[in-house]
């Protein structure tokens, strides 16, 4: 947690582009929302050509959906949406009209990492001191 899922047409992103997008999303998340690098997950899923639609017409849309711990204010989430959109457009060359980016809130108590319920935003240090040694993380 967080989990970002990037859905794109098969063949539309090279390995290098996926790497840049994954690193960029990770950096945006850490810069704006905080947290621990090792817990930022980015997963790419691909659909076959002809199976993506935009406005009811076959196309090649890209969708980036993120689930983050609830508790960040809207200004942070808006900045994240904007930064991830710019990143995806710059790296992939996709038209803004074919890109959708969303961020959803998940209560920390509804998510686990390494078998441990996540802390609320701002409580990471105490959580890390408690479970960090169990997960092999420095406190």
Placement of each model-derived feature along the sequence:
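A domain-level signal for the structural core that forms small-molecule/cofactor-binding pockets
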Residues: 1-139
């Amino acid at each position: 947690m967080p989990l970002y899922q990037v859905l794109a047409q098969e063949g539309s992103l090279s390995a290098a582009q996926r790497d840049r997008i994954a690193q960029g999303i990770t950096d945006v998340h850490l810069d704006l929302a905080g947290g621990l690098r090792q817990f930022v997950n980015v997963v790419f899923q691909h659909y076959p050509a002809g199976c993506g639609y935009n406005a009811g017409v076959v196309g090649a849309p890209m969708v980036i959906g993120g689930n983050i711990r609830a508790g960040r204010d809207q200004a942070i989430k808006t900045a994240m949406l904007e930064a991830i959109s710019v990143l995806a457009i710059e790296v992939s060359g996709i038209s803004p009209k074919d890109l959708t980016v969303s961020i959803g809130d998940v209560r920390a108590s509804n998510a686990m990492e390494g078998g441990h319920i996540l802390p609320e935003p701002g409580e990471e240090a105490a959580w890390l001191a408690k479970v960090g040694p169990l997960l092999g993380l420095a406190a």
